[in-house]
UniProtKB/Swiss-Prot annotation:
The record marks 414 as: Essential for nucleobase transport. Changing residue 455 to V: In a colorectal cancer sample; somatic mutation. It comes from Homo sapiens. This is Equilibrative nucleoside transporter 1. The gene is SLC29A1. Residues 254-276 are annotated as: Disordered. NCBIfam families: 2a57 (TIGR00939). Glycans are attached at residue 48. Belongs to the SLC29A/ENT transporter (TC 2.A.57) family. Residues 30-82, 131-138, 200-206, 312-323, 379-393, 453-456 are extracellular. Changing residue 338 to S: Decrease in the transport capacity and substrate affinity for adenosine. Resistance to dipyridamole, dilazep, nitrobenzylmercaptopurine riboside (NBMPR), draflazine and soluflazine. Keywords: Cell membrane, Glycoprotein, Membrane, Phosphoprotein, Transmembrane, Transmembrane helix, Transport. Changing residue 414 to S: Loss of nucleobase transport.
Amino acid sequence: MTTSHQPQDRYKAVWLIFFMLGLGTLLPWNFFMTATQYFTNRLDMSQNVSLVTAELSKDAQASAAPAAPLPERNSLSAIFNNVMTLCAMLPLLLFTYLNSFLHQRIPQSVRILGSLVAILLVFLITAILVKVQLDALPFFVITMIKIVLINSFGAILQGSLFGLAGLLPASYTAPIMSGQGLAGFFASVAMICAIASGSELSESAFGYFITACAVIILTIICYLGLPRLEFYRYYQQLKLEGPGEQETKLDLISKGEEPRAGKEESGVSVSNSQPTNESHSIKAILKNISVLAFSVCFIFTITIGMFPAVTVEVKSSIAGSSTWERYFIPVSCFLTFNIFDWLGRSLTAVFMWPGKDSRWLPSLVLARLVFVPLLLLCNIKPRRYLTVVFEHDAWFIFFMAAFAFSNGYLASLCMCFGPKKVKPAEAETAGAIMAFFLCLGLALGAVFSFLFRAIV
């Protein structure tokens, strides 16, 4: 079959849909992560209300005694960021691993649509609970359960999406990575707007989570339109057929008909005519992509080890009592990270260096280890062991920008190159394996975040 027979991605519709799907995979986690101020404030307020209620219930003699000062921060809010990261990343790892088996047994449309609908329901519940008063402990537990759920379904969604993108040209992994980067930027801007509105915290949070629901609904609509596009259907069928069958199949697609032989649900296939040793096949694929897989794992171990659990504890040295104090973490930590992470991911759409077989790629990945001491020596408070070396806000912003850009660019390179180091028929499995190692890095980073915070 000649290249002239290949359909074109008209108006970049498939590219844009994959961008929206990438946005949908990380939007839930980013909205929860960026809203840490809302969650910790709710925990502190609930704790204070409980203490006041306890005081009022005492007898007159006890109430006449001086009341003990209320704690500025209760134990649940103090550990919220670390526990949130752990509850997010461990389910992400587990369900990404399960997805490497589920993708051969559960239709792609069920995995993707089911995950998006489940995430939408969790956000609707979150928005409703903004209006419901809860004690600190029940609120903490319910929040962690929701984080577990959105990341479990997010793992299935992400693994399915990278496997799906592995069947298309390499440039179609880039919009997923770029969309994921924009998810963080979108969440950061939404939170800054909520703060700037001057509304009550509960009102701002309600609008914030409803906005997330609207974006997820838009993502679902985009996915439902994907199978209607000729370009997408063409690449979906390539792995099902030998070269001799592809021209006949293309003619059917161009006429809007579905090929009848070897056709399963769009995006999912298990060819009965080509039995293989699945375990041996996965080992062979892993051997081919091992450097890239371990590279993406290391990238996210360092990233999640520091962000957000450690970086949100950095305090401004110049804000004083100005409004910059309220915006310092949303802007310097979340917005800066998400802008530069998105720029790094997006750059791979037009520029890919080093190549997939270059030794420079793993070398640059290992070099990111330098960001651990650089960020730990910023103005983190409270601190017990390390001294502050980089106190000024500008140092922290500069380190966050470089930290984020290198994360987005190098991770996107690894995810783009992984499925292209194996045969086209193995690309979906390679994409799922790469997604698993990405999530392994996230889980390891969540564990290391406790260590990194403890040594400060």
